[in-house]
Protein backbone atom coordinates (compact mmCIF):
# COMPACT_ATOMS: atom_id res chain seq x y z
CA UNK A 1 0.00 0.00 0.00
CA UNK A 2 1.07 3.55 -0.66
CA UNK A 3 1.96 5.50 2.40
CA UNK A 4 -0.73 7.87 3.57
CA UNK A 5 0.29 11.35 2.47
CA UNK A 6 -1.23 14.19 4.44
CA UNK A 7 -3.80 16.32 2.71
CA UNK A 8 -3.20 19.92 1.87
CA UNK A 9 -5.51 21.07 4.62
CA UNK A 10 -3.69 18.87 7.17
CA UNK A 11 -0.44 20.57 6.17
CA UNK A 12 -2.07 23.96 6.54
CA UNK A 13 -3.31 23.02 10.01
CA UNK A 14 0.26 22.25 11.06
CA UNK A 15 1.33 25.86 10.42
CA UNK A 16 -1.84 27.84 11.19
CA UNK A 17 -2.72 28.54 14.81
CA UNK A 18 -5.92 26.92 16.03
CA UNK A 19 -7.76 30.22 16.54
CA UNK A 20 -7.06 31.22 12.89
CA UNK A 21 -7.91 27.94 11.10
CA UNK A 22 -11.60 28.73 10.61
CA UNK A 23 -10.83 32.04 8.92
CA UNK A 24 -8.10 30.52 6.73
CA UNK A 25 -10.49 27.77 5.67
CA UNK A 26 -13.08 30.38 4.69
CA UNK A 27 -10.51 32.25 2.59
CA UNK A 28 -9.38 29.08 0.79
CA UNK A 29 -12.97 27.94 0.26
CA UNK A 30 -14.82 25.77 2.70
CA UNK A 31 -16.47 23.72 -0.06
CA UNK A 32 -13.13 22.90 -1.70
CA UNK A 33 -11.52 21.94 1.61
CA UNK A 34 -14.47 19.72 2.59
CA UNK A 35 -14.46 18.10 -0.86
CA UNK A 36 -10.79 17.19 -0.58
CA UNK A 37 -11.35 15.66 2.85
CA UNK A 38 -14.36 13.66 1.62
CA UNK A 39 -12.45 12.36 -1.41
CA UNK A 40 -9.55 11.33 0.81
CA UNK A 41 -11.91 9.45 3.11
CA UNK A 42 -13.43 7.67 0.11
CA UNK A 43 -9.97 6.63 -1.09
CA UNK A 44 -9.19 5.15 2.33
CA UNK A 45 -12.51 3.26 2.35
CA UNK A 46 -11.95 1.81 -1.16
CA UNK A 47 -8.45 0.70 -0.23
CA UNK A 48 -9.78 -1.09 2.83
CA UNK A 49 -12.52 -2.81 0.80
CA UNK A 50 -10.06 -3.91 -1.85
CA UNK A 51 -7.65 -5.30 0.70
CA UNK A 52 -10.47 -7.14 2.46
CA UNK A 53 -11.74 -8.62 -0.83
CA UNK A 54 -8.30 -9.89 -1.74
CA UNK A 55 -7.56 -11.32 1.69
CA UNK A 56 -10.85 -13.25 1.63
CA UNK A 57 -9.82 -14.94 -1.63
CA UNK A 58 -6.25 -15.61 -0.56
CA UNK A 59 -5.14 -19.28 -0.63
CA UNK A 60 -5.59 -19.69 3.12
CA UNK A 61 -7.80 -22.79 2.91
CA UNK A 62 -4.83 -25.10 2.41
CA UNK A 63 -3.90 -27.33 5.31
CA UNK A 64 -1.31 -25.76 7.58
CA UNK A 65 0.37 -29.16 7.80
CA UNK A 66 1.47 -28.71 4.20
CA UNK A 67 4.83 -26.87 4.34
CA UNK A 68 4.55 -25.75 0.74
CA UNK A 69 1.39 -23.79 1.55
CA UNK A 70 3.50 -21.41 3.61
CA UNK A 71 5.69 -20.54 0.60
CA UNK A 72 3.35 -18.35 -1.40
CA UNK A 73 5.40 -16.25 -3.82
CA UNK A 74 5.44 -12.47 -3.37
CA UNK A 75 3.62 -10.40 -6.01
CA UNK A 76 6.77 -9.29 -7.84
CA UNK A 77 8.17 -12.83 -7.89
CA UNK A 78 4.82 -14.16 -9.11
CA UNK A 79 4.84 -11.80 -12.07
CA UNK A 80 8.42 -12.78 -12.93
CA UNK A 81 7.64 -16.50 -12.73
CA UNK A 82 4.50 -15.99 -14.81
CA UNK A 83 6.53 -14.38 -17.61
CA UNK A 84 9.18 -17.13 -17.51
CA UNK A 85 6.56 -19.89 -17.57
CA UNK A 86 4.81 -18.28 -20.54
CA UNK A 87 8.06 -18.22 -22.49
CA UNK A 88 8.75 -21.87 -21.65
CA UNK A 89 5.24 -22.92 -22.68
CA UNK A 90 5.60 -21.12 -25.98
CA UNK A 91 8.90 -22.92 -26.53
CA UNK A 92 7.29 -26.29 -25.79
CA UNK A 93 4.50 -25.59 -28.25
CA UNK A 94 7.00 -24.61 -30.94
CA UNK A 95 8.98 -27.77 -30.27
CA UNK A 96 5.84 -29.91 -30.63
CA UNK A 97 5.05 -28.27 -33.97
CA UNK A 98 8.64 -28.80 -35.11
CA UNK A 99 8.50 -32.48 -34.19
CA UNK A 100 5.16 -32.99 -35.94
CA UNK A 101 3.22 -33.58 -32.72
CA UNK A 102 -0.12 -32.12 -31.74
CA UNK A 103 0.61 -28.81 -30.05
CA UNK A 104 -2.46 -29.29 -27.86
CA UNK A 105 -0.70 -32.25 -26.23
CA UNK A 106 2.51 -30.34 -25.49
CA UNK A 107 1.33 -29.19 -22.05
CA UNK A 108 -0.76 -32.13 -20.84
CA UNK A 109 1.94 -33.47 -18.51
CA UNK A 110 2.11 -30.29 -16.44
CA UNK A 111 0.03 -29.22 -13.48
CA UNK A 112 -3.30 -27.57 -14.41
CA UNK A 113 -2.82 -25.12 -11.55
CA UNK A 114 0.54 -24.02 -12.94
CA UNK A 115 -0.89 -23.71 -16.46
CA UNK A 116 -3.80 -21.65 -15.16
CA UNK A 117 -1.39 -19.46 -13.23
CA UNK A 118 0.89 -18.91 -16.24
CA UNK A 119 -1.81 -18.28 -18.84
CA UNK A 120 -4.24 -16.13 -16.89
CA UNK A 121 -4.01 -12.38 -17.17
CA UNK A 122 -2.39 -10.90 -14.06
CA UNK A 123 -5.01 -9.17 -12.03
CA UNK A 124 -4.76 -5.57 -10.94
CA UNK A 125 -2.81 -6.08 -7.73
CA UNK A 126 -3.01 -3.20 -5.32
CA UNK A 127 -2.60 -0.35 -7.80
CA UNK A 128 0.37 1.31 -6.12
CA UNK A 129 2.38 1.52 -9.31
CA UNK A 130 -0.40 3.11 -11.35
CA UNK A 131 -1.22 5.62 -8.61
CA UNK A 132 2.46 6.31 -8.01
CA UNK A 133 2.94 7.14 -11.68
CA UNK A 134 -0.19 9.29 -11.64
CA UNK A 135 1.19 11.29 -8.75
CA UNK A 136 4.44 11.92 -10.60
CA UNK A 137 6.59 9.40 -8.71
CA UNK A 138 7.72 11.83 -6.03
CA UNK A 139 6.67 13.65 -2.89
CA UNK A 140 3.65 15.89 -3.01
CA UNK A 141 4.27 19.20 -4.71
CA UNK A 142 1.95 20.79 -2.17
CA UNK A 143 4.25 19.70 0.66
CA UNK A 144 7.25 21.29 -1.06
CA UNK A 145 5.39 24.52 -1.68
CA UNK A 146 4.07 24.75 1.88
CA UNK A 147 7.56 24.39 3.26
CA UNK A 148 8.43 27.56 1.36
CA UNK A 149 5.35 29.63 2.23
CA UNK A 150 4.87 28.49 5.81
CA UNK A 151 5.61 31.99 7.09
CA UNK A 152 2.60 33.33 5.16
CA UNK A 153 0.16 30.79 6.61
CA UNK A 154 -1.62 33.11 9.00
CA UNK A 155 -4.57 35.45 8.92
CA UNK A 156 -2.39 38.51 8.36
CA UNK A 157 -0.55 37.16 5.28
CA UNK A 158 -2.93 34.47 3.94
CA UNK A 159 -4.12 36.76 1.14
CA UNK A 160 -0.61 36.65 -0.39
CA UNK A 161 -0.70 32.86 -0.87
CA UNK A 162 -4.45 32.18 -1.02
CA UNK A 163 -4.53 31.92 -4.80
CA UNK A 164 -1.61 29.50 -4.83
CA UNK A 165 -3.19 27.35 -2.12
CA UNK A 166 -6.50 27.24 -3.98
CA UNK A 167 -4.67 25.92 -7.06
CA UNK A 168 -2.97 23.22 -4.99
CA UNK A 169 -6.28 22.29 -3.41
CA UNK A 170 -7.96 21.96 -6.81
CA UNK A 171 -5.09 19.80 -8.09
CA UNK A 172 -5.37 17.55 -5.04
CA UNK A 173 -9.08 17.02 -5.64
CA UNK A 174 -8.49 16.02 -9.27
CA UNK A 175 -5.77 13.57 -8.21
CA UNK A 176 -8.03 11.99 -5.61
CA UNK A 177 -10.85 11.62 -8.13
CA UNK A 178 -8.56 9.74 -10.55
CA UNK A 179 -7.32 7.54 -7.73
CA UNK A 180 -10.92 6.71 -6.80
CA UNK A 181 -11.60 5.60 -10.38
CA UNK A 182 -8.57 3.28 -10.31
CA UNK A 183 -9.59 1.72 -7.00
CA UNK A 184 -13.20 1.28 -8.13
CA UNK A 185 -12.05 -0.50 -11.29
CA UNK A 186 -9.80 -2.85 -9.34
CA UNK A 187 -12.55 -3.56 -6.83
CA UNK A 188 -15.04 -4.30 -9.60
CA UNK A 189 -12.61 -6.67 -11.30
CA UNK A 190 -12.05 -8.43 -8.00
CA UNK A 191 -15.75 -9.13 -7.43
CA UNK A 192 -16.41 -10.06 -11.06
CA UNK A 193 -13.65 -12.63 -10.96
CA UNK A 194 -15.03 -16.20 -10.90
CA UNK A 195 -15.11 -17.35 -7.32
CA UNK A 196 -15.52 -21.02 -6.50
CA UNK A 197 -15.00 -22.89 -3.25
CA UNK A 198 -11.88 -24.48 -4.70
CA UNK A 199 -10.50 -21.30 -6.29
CA UNK A 200 -8.09 -20.75 -3.44
CA UNK A 201 -6.55 -24.13 -4.12
CA UNK A 202 -5.88 -23.15 -7.74
CA UNK A 203 -3.07 -20.83 -6.67
CA UNK A 204 0.17 -22.85 -6.96
CA UNK A 205 2.88 -22.64 -4.34
CA UNK A 206 6.34 -21.28 -4.96
CA UNK A 207 7.84 -24.76 -4.71
CA UNK A 208 5.37 -26.12 -7.26
CA UNK A 209 6.08 -23.27 -9.67
CA UNK A 210 9.83 -23.82 -9.47
CA UNK A 211 9.44 -27.59 -9.88
CA UNK A 212 7.27 -27.26 -12.99
CA UNK A 213 9.57 -24.57 -14.40
CA UNK A 214 12.56 -26.91 -14.02
CA UNK A 215 10.68 -29.74 -15.76
CA UNK A 216 9.83 -27.48 -18.70
CA UNK A 217 13.44 -26.38 -19.03
CA UNK A 218 14.62 -30.00 -19.03
CA UNK A 219 12.14 -30.93 -21.74
CA UNK A 220 13.23 -28.02 -23.89
CA UNK A 221 16.89 -28.98 -23.45
CA UNK A 222 16.18 -32.59 -24.47
CA UNK A 223 17.15 -33.73 -27.97
CA UNK A 224 14.67 -32.68 -30.59
CA UNK A 225 13.04 -35.09 -33.04
CA UNK A 226 14.42 -35.95 -36.51
CA UNK A 227 12.03 -33.54 -38.22
CA UNK A 228 13.72 -30.62 -36.47
CA UNK A 229 17.20 -31.65 -37.63
CA UNK A 230 18.56 -30.34 -40.89
CA UNK A 231 19.37 -32.84 -43.70
CA UNK A 232 23.08 -32.11 -43.46
CA UNK A 233 23.04 -32.85 -39.75
CA UNK A 234 21.27 -36.16 -40.33
CA UNK A 235 23.63 -37.31 -43.06
CA UNK A 236 26.80 -36.59 -41.12
CA UNK A 237 26.44 -39.34 -38.48
CA UNK A 238 25.04 -41.72 -41.09
CA UNK A 239 28.16 -41.52 -43.22
CA UNK A 240 30.55 -41.80 -40.29
CA UNK A 241 28.73 -44.80 -38.81
CA UNK A 242 28.57 -46.78 -42.05
CA UNK A 243 32.01 -45.96 -43.33
CA UNK A 244 33.55 -49.01 -41.70
CA UNK A 245 30.77 -51.30 -42.98
CA UNK A 246 31.12 -50.33 -46.63
CA UNK A 247 32.21 -53.34 -48.78
CA UNK A 248 35.75 -53.07 -50.19
CA UNK A 249 36.32 -52.25 -53.82
CA UNK A 250 36.77 -55.23 -56.17
CA UNK A 251 40.40 -56.27 -56.59
CA UNK A 252 42.05 -56.19 -59.95
CA UNK A 253 41.36 -59.39 -61.92
CA UNK A 254 38.86 -60.79 -59.42
CA UNK A 255 35.31 -61.56 -60.48
CA UNK A 256 32.60 -59.54 -58.74
CA UNK A 257 31.08 -62.68 -57.26
CA UNK A 258 34.15 -63.23 -55.10
CA UNK A 259 33.15 -60.31 -52.91
CA UNK A 260 30.62 -62.72 -51.36
CA UNK A 261 33.08 -65.53 -50.56
CA UNK A 262 32.35 -67.56 -47.44
CA UNK A 263 33.79 -66.55 -44.09
CA UNK A 264 37.28 -67.77 -43.04
CA UNK A 265 35.99 -70.74 -40.92
CA UNK A 266 35.84 -72.72 -44.21
CA UNK A 267 39.54 -72.01 -44.80
CA UNK A 268 40.82 -75.56 -44.06
CA UNK A 269 38.64 -76.97 -46.84
CA UNK A 270 39.68 -74.41 -49.43
CA UNK A 271 43.38 -74.11 -48.66
CA UNK A 272 45.44 -75.16 -51.76
CA UNK A 273 48.39 -77.44 -51.54
CA UNK A 274 52.00 -76.71 -52.25
CA UNK A 275 53.88 -73.49 -51.66
CA UNK A 276 50.73 -71.32 -51.62
CA UNK A 277 49.41 -73.33 -48.65
CA UNK A 278 51.33 -71.04 -46.28
CA UNK A 279 49.40 -67.99 -47.54
CA UNK A 280 46.45 -66.66 -45.54
CA UNK A 281 42.91 -66.33 -46.82
CA UNK A 282 43.11 -62.61 -47.61
CA UNK A 283 46.49 -62.85 -49.39
CA UNK A 284 45.21 -65.56 -51.74
CA UNK A 285 42.80 -63.05 -53.33
CA UNK A 286 45.64 -60.69 -54.26
CA UNK A 287 46.42 -62.16 -57.64
CA UNK A 288 47.38 -60.41 -60.80
CA UNK A 289 45.29 -60.51 -64.00
CA UNK A 290 47.86 -62.80 -65.70
CA UNK A 291 47.33 -65.64 -63.23
CA UNK A 292 43.92 -66.50 -64.68
CA UNK A 293 40.54 -66.57 -63.03
CA UNK A 294 40.49 -66.80 -59.30
CA UNK A 295 37.78 -69.45 -59.33
CA UNK A 296 40.31 -72.15 -60.42
CA UNK A 297 41.59 -72.93 -56.91
CA UNK A 298 38.05 -73.26 -55.67
CA UNK A 299 37.07 -75.65 -58.44
CA UNK A 300 40.17 -77.78 -57.86
CA UNK A 301 39.80 -77.71 -54.13
CA UNK A 302 36.12 -78.58 -54.06
CA UNK A 303 36.49 -82.29 -55.05
CA UNK A 304 39.34 -82.73 -52.56
CA UNK A 305 37.15 -81.87 -49.61
CA UNK A 306 35.56 -85.36 -49.29
CA UNK A 307 39.02 -87.02 -49.42
From Swiss-Prot:
List residues traversing the bilayer: none
Q: Which Pfam families match?
A: CCDC24
Q: Where is this region: Disordered?
A: 223-245, 271-307
Q: Which domain of life is it from?
A: Eukaryota
Keyword line? Coiled coil
Which cysteines does the record link by disulfide bonds?
none
**Coiled-coil regions listed in the entry:** 168-225
Gene Ontology biological-process annotations: blastocyst hatching
Regions of biased composition (Polar residues) lie at 296-307
What is the protein name given in its UniProt record? Coiled-coil domain-containing protein 24
Q: Native species of this protein?
A: Homo sapiens (Human)
Lineage from the top down?
A: Eukaryota, Metazoa, Chordata, Craniata, Vertebrata
